[in-house]
Amino acid sequence: MIVEDKLKGLGLNLPDLDEQYRKNASGARFISHYAVQNVLYLSGTTPFKDGQPFNTGVVGQDLTLEQGYEAARYATLTSLAAVKYALGDLDRVQQIIQVIGFVNSAPGFSDQPRVINGTTDLLVELFGDRGKPTRAAIGCQGLAINHSVEIVMTVLFSGSEVRGPLGRDHYAG
């Protein structure tokens, strides 16, 4: 529980993944994760705080770079909630293999890498060198529910036990 202690020390909490999946405001259909041997592939996650979408909007228009950075940190917390759901313990993470970050960007905005630093900085704070991923930071025009950031993460883990995924296979009514 070392990683979770670090989270608490930073004043951060993992969101309730099951609650987010039950709400499914986007109507998207997918599963939370899929494991192949000791590699955990995660679906894209977006920033939530206190159960609500956090820092929504277009970075470089509605939001500053700093607000986008903070949104990336909160999207990372959602990814880590999926890792904990799957593995039961964040300390089983051996390496964050890859992060792909999408930034809902205004025309001409070119600081996507600095926005997605919010993700990698948090991962390094929590996991040290194990949190240094390969990475892409991609600007896009529009994300579901006007989210500012979406993170896709791939993780190498220890042990063999993996909980089955949560499914978003319905439309919220």
Q: Which residue stretches match the model-derived regions?
A:
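N-terminal presequence-like segments and the immediate start of the first folded domain
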Residues: M1-L77, A81, Y85-I97, S105-G173
